[in-house]
Amino acid sequence: MGKRLGRTLALAGVQTSQKSESELIDMFHDIMKTGMHGICFSLYEDGQEPGDIIGEEQVRRRVEIIKPHTEWVRSFSCIEGNELIPRIAKENGLKTLVGAWLNDDTEKNEEE
C-alpha cells in the first residue's frame, strides 16, 4: 500500500484474498481514518443508473460524504449531473480529474 503525506495512494499489491474479514475491516477503517489521495467518484445512489439525471443537491450530498477522506475525485462523465462535480468539488476544497464516457453513440459522445 503506497502512502503520501499519511494518505493511502493505492491498494495495488495488497493481497486481500490472504486477509481475514476482520483484517479487511481493520484495513478499511484505517484507510478511512487516514484518508486517500484520490478516489473514483460515482453520483449514483441505490436504484439509480447511467442515464438518470442527478441534481445538484445529490451531488453536494455525495461530495460531503467523501470530502473528509480524500483530496481528489475522478468522475466518469460530463453529462446527466456529472458536469456539476468539478464546481462542487472545488467549493469543498477537492481537486478533480474529469472523465468522459465514450461509446458507439456519436451523438452522446458529442455531449460528453
Language-model segment annotations:
Residues 2-65, 69-71:
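Boundary/entry segment of secreted carbohydrate-active catalytic domains
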Residues 25, 60-63, 82, 86, ...:
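Generic structural signal for well-ordered alpha-helices
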Residues 40-42, 74-76, 97-101:
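A cross-family glycoside hydrolase active-site/sugar-binding cleft signature
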Residues 68-72, 92-95:
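Loop/turn elements at helix/coil->beta-strand transitions in domains of secreted/extracellular proteins
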Residues 72-84, 103-110:
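Acidic-and-aromatic substrate-binding clefts and catalytic sites of carbohydrate-active enzymes
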Residues 87-112:
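Substrate-binding cleft of extracellular glycoside hydrolase catalytic domains
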